[in-house]
Amino acid sequence: MTRDVGGLIRVAEERDAPAIAGIYAPAITDGVISFELTPPDAQEMLRRIVAIQQQYPWLVYEESETVLGYVYASVHNERAAYRWSVDVTAYIRHDAHRRGIGRALYTALFEILVLQGYRTACAGVTLPNTASVQMHAAMGFKEVGVYHDVGYKFGKWHDVGWYERSLAAHVLEPPEPVPFPELAGTTHVKAAFARAAGLIKST
C-alpha cells in the first residue's frame, strides 16, 4: 500500500453537509455509537458545522471529490474554568475503515488544537466498541472512567467510557484559546493538513 492517495484534509464547508449527514446517520440508526435517535438532515448538520466553527475546528477528509470522514472539537463543559478542554469526535464512512483516516484526522485536529491553546482532549465511547477504544489508545488517550447504564436506546441501557489526552503542558495562567477562524487559513494549519493526509493508506 502506498501513502500517495491523492486525498486531502481540509476545513469543512457548506457543500459538505449532505455527505457529513450521510456518514453520521448509520451511527444513529444502526447502533448505539451515537445516543441521538433521529438523524439530522443536511440543513441541521450545516447549522452544527457553522456553530462549531465559530470557535473549534471541523475538518473533513476528501478523496476523489468524496468526503470519507470528518472530525471536530466541541465544548467540554459550559463552565468557564473548563474552557481549555474540548470534546473530540470522529466519524468515518463505513466503506473507508482501516485506512488510517480517523487517526489522520485526529492528528490534524490535535495539531490545530495545540495551536489554539487547548490543553486536554476528551472522548466518550459507547461500550463495547473495541475498534474505537483501540484507536483512541493508539492516539494517546487514557481511560479515566465509565458511566454505567447512562444511555437508554433500542430497549437497552448502555455504558459510556471516557478517555482523555493531554495536548500541551498545563501551565499556570494559560492564555485564552484562539478562535479557529483566526488560524484556519494559516500556513501552520495547511502544513498540519498535509502532514496528516500523508498518513492515510490507499485502498
Predicted features and spans:
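Acetyl-CoA-dependent GNAT
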Residues: 39-95, 106-107, 166-167
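Conserved acetyl-CoA-binding loop-helix of GNAT-fold acetyltransferases
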Residues: 98-111, 131-138
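Conserved GNAT acetyl-CoA-binding A-motif
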Residues: 113-125
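Glycine-rich acetyl-CoA-binding "A-motif" of GNAT/NAT acetyltransferases
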Residues: 66-70, 131, 157
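Acidic/histidine-enriched, glycine/proline-rich intrinsically disordered or flexible terminal extensions
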Residues: 169-203
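Conserved catalytic-core motifs of GNAT/GCN5-like acyltransferases
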Residues: 72, 122-125, 137, 142-159, ...
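Conserved GNAT-fold acetyl-CoA-binding loop/helix
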Residues: 21-48
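A short beta-loop-alpha structural element at the N-terminal edge
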Residues: 8-20
